[in-house]
Amino acid sequence: SGSCTTKTCWTMLPNFRSVGDVLKEKYERTLQVEPVKAKRTRRPTFLKVKDSENYRKPRLSHLVFLHRSPNYCEFDENNGSMGTVGRRCNRTSTSTDSCDLMCCGRGYNTHQYTKIWQCNCKF
């Protein structure tokens, strides 16, 4: 008989939300590390958790960083950050332009503007 069987295998990515949740959880538990030069010349440099007394190495599953990020809320000429003081924000937004996020907990002033323009309406 001339029958044939076909098998198809595929790999699916997990739900995008679950990937984001795992990354956020890892981000909230990051470890600061520092490079340590091995004492023996044949051994490579490795990373240890900073401020750990017993040269504890991070696990492969940990998210690590070498230097703390600058505070982008404040003006810092050395890092090229203009800060967020004086920037326009959206009080009702829940996105990156929200006042709660952009003002870094300092509070904000509200201003109301009226704009008048010709609309070239035809009746």
Swiss-Prot record:
The keyword Disulfide bond applies. A lipid is attached at S1 (O-palmitoleoyl serine). SMART domains: WNT1. It is found in: Secreted, Extracellular space, Extracellular matrix. Keywords: Developmental protein, Disulfide bond, Extracellular matrix, Glycoprotein, Lipoprotein, Secreted, Wnt signaling pathway. GO terms for cellular component: extracellular region. Signal peptide: none annotated. Belongs to the Wnt family. Ligand for members of the frizzled family of seven transmembrane receptors. Probable developmental protein. May be a signaling molecule which affects the development of discrete regions of tissues. Is likely to signal over only few cell diameters. This is Protein Wnt-7. It comes from Strongylocentrotus purpuratus.
